[in-house]
Amino acid sequence: MNVVGSWYNVRKDLEAVLDHLFQLPPEDFVEFDSLLTVEEFDELGYACNFPHLTCVLCALDKSDLPAFASGGLRLDHGYSPSRTSMALLPATCYKVYLERRGQSLSATRVIGCIAKCFRHEDKPLDCYRDYNFTMKEFVCLGAAEDAKLHIKRGGAIIDLIMRELDIPFEYELAADPFFDMSSSVATLSKALPTKQEVIYDGHAVASLNHHRNYFGRKFEITLNAEPISTSCVAFGLERWIAMLRDRYGDPVQVIKKLSLLAKAAPPSTSSTEAHTAVTLSETRP
């Protein structure tokens, strides 16, 4: 999806609203590149769980370069490079965990991050779904209660934004699209749901993800000698632009509403009790 004209300004204003409401200092924000080494990708286990969504970066084989240069060989659907050099990032938060593997944290912290992500979608593409997209996330790393509170606060922020933008929405418990839905990881995901999606007109535009101590154990990230818990609040920016365009049509109206949100008081810790989404940690099959 191309974001052009005034809708580009809408996206910038939307990001500014999110940054304001999550109240992070500038030093806690990072924009990641979209590349992972094949070793990092293997360490994540993504290709094991989601081989159908995996995207990799390949270069033309050196032996084929003269043929391409002379026009004797062309890039088409039948061309198969023999080596994969890098993998493409499927979710922004993975970079946060990879950067901290083997580390001991001194306190819980929240990281704001953004990156262009890639998934080889197996569903029809439209203005809400594409092979590449921009994912902005707010990731909590630390104590178990802090990770739960981050989800509640993220939900309260989403509630505030959608209410002020006058956008109808609902929360749905969601399961990641594992390739093998009978695998142990997929079965555990069903038994202990980790994700709520924010749904507008049948489209997921954001998600609340509670990983418990999965990434802390996997990457040996600790706090007080125990594996950390993690949670993240994720926003697909192109999906938000599509939603706002469908809802309003006129970017000027959206910019006015976002300017008011940029001055709104962020939800307090106590106000998260008003968040109406299902609490993941309390969900049972």
Task: Provide a role label for each language-model segment.
Residues M1-E282:
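TRNA-recognition modules of translation machinery and tRNA-sensing kinases, especially anticodon-binding
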